[in-house]
Amino acid sequence: MKVNGQFITLEHPCKLKEFLESRQLNPLYVAVELNGEIVRKKDFEIVTLKEEDTVEIVSFVGGG
């Protein structure tokens, strides 16, 4: 699977929310594009990632 331009090995298909949490990313504070399409937050628990997917993850950072 390709994540933010880097290839990683996905041991088995998993839900997007599980994947984000395994990378210490809070699903509330990220935007995700999967194979060129934005994934709605309400779908994070039902979307399944597969080895052939391309994922872009953007984290929101507060500041002033």
Go through each PLM region and give its residues:
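Ubiquitin-like/PB1-type beta-grasp interaction modules and other compact soluble beta-rich domains
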Residues: M1-G63
